[in-house]
Amino acid sequence: EKQIAKDMEDNILTDGAIKKMTLNTLFERYMATRELADTTRVSYVRAWENRVKDEIGNIKVVQLLPSHIKAYYAKLSKAGYAYSTIKYIHNLLYPALEMAVDDDIIRKNPAKSSISDYGKPAEEKEALTVSQQEKFMEFVKQSNVYNTYYPMFTIMIGTGLRCGELIGLTWKDINIKAKTVNVDHQLIYKNLGDGCKFHISTPNRIIPMTQEVAKAFEEQRKINFMLAKDKSIEVDGYSGFVFTAKSGRPLMPNGVNSVLYNIVDAYNKTEVERAKKEHRKAERLPKFSAHVMRHTACTRMAECRMDVKVLQYIMGHAHIDVTMEVYNHIGELTRIEKEIARLDSMALNA
């Protein structure tokens, strides 16, 4: 009775329907209040249904305790989920429960605790070394199977474009004479529930291209013509895509990654056979994605001591901290190399 009196005094709702509200129902109410892009909404709902709905979703909101949330995060962590995945789920739970606090359904947000102790640390995506990059590009160039992708990879390394920006490029975006690439959209492939379609977003910048990149674009146009890949298919008002499948439709991000994985597998198989014949240890390439290609491009530019603000602009980084991380990493490696060289020098002079 004292609790009821306090609830009434503090204006905490005591309606029966409110008391029976589950976390799943609260999430539905929360999503109804949000103005979201279709792709974002589908991603949120899918994450909830796959990860939360049957785990803690049926617990009544008024009975949900911080220990429930912590135990759930611990379970995800033990199952091998990364910190980023748990944080994604937390970013769904926390605001929904905060809305319940604002609506006076509960007094405190049970998700109001640190999640830093949960989840596997994200694996650091290392850029390819100069040697690895050269070996990869040379293998592609000499391959009878993959050589048609050589211009695309040259452009990826030379521009640092995001995969979505790369596959979204149209020939209208390319100015060979001025040596510029107009980046004002990217192509994102999402399953929106009612079938798969493309979504255009707009990170806007105009980036310069090197002579090598300009030559690669010219070569890509020839390849498209020779392979009859220059058909005009329109996607959300865009047509004349630079990189397409045989159908004329733009490449998919997972398609680009699949090609990269297949090339690395083929290279490593060849390298292992060659190493056996030469009686040496095989120097395999690591499995890497289009995102690592972008990180590699950023690293090469930073290694040339490109002005950090210029590099931030070229890469389209929203925050300069992201760009600075690359510079700091390079600086750290340089310091290590100098120390090793110093030790070698001391050993030789001993």
Predicted regions, residues:
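N-terminal helical hairpins
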Residues: 1-20, 34
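N-terminal core-binding DNA-recognition domain of tyrosine site-specific recombinases/integrases
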Residues: 19, 31-110, 122-124, 144-145, ...
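Short, basic (Lys/Arg/His-rich) helix/loop patches that form interaction surfaces
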Residues: 79, 83, 138-149, 159, ...
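Basic, Lys/Arg- and aromatic-enriched nucleic-acid-binding interface segment
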Residues: 87-89, 102, 106-169, 176-177, ...
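Proline-centered turn/helix-capping motifs that create local helix->coil transitions or kinks
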Residues: 101-110, 173-179, 217-233, 268-274
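DNA/chromatin major-groove-contacting recognition/catalytic segments
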Residues: 136, 192-198, 304, 325, ...
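Short, polar N-cap/turn motifs at the start of nucleic acid-interacting alpha helices
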Residues: 173-180, 306-326
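C-terminal secondary-structure termini that scaffold catalytic or DNA-interacting sites
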Residues: 178, 191-213, 219, 223-226, ...
